[in-house]
Amino acid sequence: TKALNDCRENVERVVAQGAPYTWENLCQPLAEVDDVLGRIFSPVSHLNSVKNSPELREAYEQTLPLLSEYSTWVGQHEGLYKAYRDLRDGDHYATLNTAQKKAVDNALRDFELSGIGLPKEKQQRYGEIATRLSELGNQYSNNVLDATMGWTKLVTDEAELAGMPESALAAAKAQAEAKELEGYLLTLDIPSYLPVMTYCDNQALREEMYRAYSTRASDQGPNAGKWDNSKVMEEILALRHELAQLLGFENYAFK
C-alpha cells in the first residue's frame, strides 16, 4: 500500500504543478514511480505462477483489488488526462521523439478506454467491472494451475518411455523419488509434458497426456468438473461485453 500511496501522491504532485507540461515534468516522473511499483509486484506475480503456495496465493489475491482500483483511479483522473492533453496540444510535443510521442498518444488512448469521458455512475460501474474481471482472471489461472498439479501418472516400466531423452527420464525419476515412489512420475508441467509429446514413442501415452493437458479446468477429461472454468469464462465474457458497451464499442474485440 505504501508503493500505491507513493504513486497516488506523485500523480497529484505532477498534476498540481500546472502547465506547461513536458516529458520531463509529466511522463518521466510517472514512469519512474510506476517502475518502482512494477519491481515490487512483478516478482510476487511471477512467484505466484511458478512457486505457488496457499500463503503466497492469499497474499497475491489481496493485492489484486488494490492494483485494479489504482489503475482505474489513474485512468479516470481528470486532472492527469488534461495534463496529457495539454502536452499533446502544446509546443513541447513537437520536440518529442517518435517513441515519446507514441507513449503520450497511447496514454490518451488508455484514458479513453478507462472511461474518462463517461458520466460518474458509469465510471463507477467501469471500476466495479474492472475489479471483478481481475478477480475472475486470477480465479481462472488458479483453476488451471490446480488442474495442472492435480494430474500425475506413475510409469513403472521404462520401456513405455522409449524415445525419451536421458535428461527427461532422470527428471521423471527424480519426481517419483521426491514422492517416495518407484518408477517415473509424469506431470502436466511443461518440463515433464513437452518431452513426452516430442520424443516418446508410446502413442497411447502421448494421447493420454494430451487429453489430460487439453481438458484441464473444464467439464471434460480425467478430472471433468473439478476446477471447472466454464462458469468463470461465462462471467468474463458477459462482463467484457458490458464493458465494451459502456465504452461505446459493439463488442470487446473492438476495445
Briefly describe each language-model feature range.
Residues 1-255:
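Zn2+-dependent metallopeptidase catalytic domains
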